[in-house]
Amino acid sequence: MAVTIDYSLCKGAECAECVNNCPMEVFEIEGDKVVVARPDDCTYCGVCEDVCPTGAVKVEPE
């Protein structure tokens, strides 16, 4: 499994719902962009995907 961000849809730091809601703190803001900073800590719970208002964050098979 992998967490991916579609940057054409992601609103980055102005939204940051994934950053603020991830129970494992997998995401970080770098500049105005959200990045998957700690992918090995991800438990693939899907919270990030559920809270993303634009559908930019996906939890998918690799």
From Swiss-Prot:
Domain 4Fe-4S ferredoxin-type intervals: 2-31, 32-62
Gene3D superfamilies: 3.30.70.20
Cited Pfam families: Fer4_7 (PF12838)
Cofactor details (free text): Binds 2 [4Fe-4S] clusters.
Residues that, per the record, bind [4Fe-4S] cluster 1: 10, 15, 18, 22
Keywords, sorted A to Z: 4Fe-4S, Electron transport, Iron, Iron-sulfur, Metal-binding, Repeat, Transport
List of residues binding [4Fe-4S] cluster 2: 42, 45, 48, 52
PROSITE patterns recorded: 4FE4S_FER_1, 4FE4S_FER_2
GO molecular function: 4 iron, 4 sulfur cluster binding; metal ion binding; oxidoreductase activity
InterPro entries named in the record: 4Fe4S_Fe-S-bd, 4Fe4S_Fe_S_CS, Fe-S_Ferredoxin
Entry keyword Coiled coil: no
Cofactor(s) the protein needs: [4Fe-4S] cluster
PANTHER family (alphabetical): 4FE-4S FERREDOXIN-TYPE DOMAIN-CONTAINING PROTEIN (PTHR43687:SF5), ADENYLYLSULFATE REDUCTASE, BETA SUBUNIT (PTHR43687)
Protein name from the UniProt record: Uncharacterized ferredoxin MJ0199
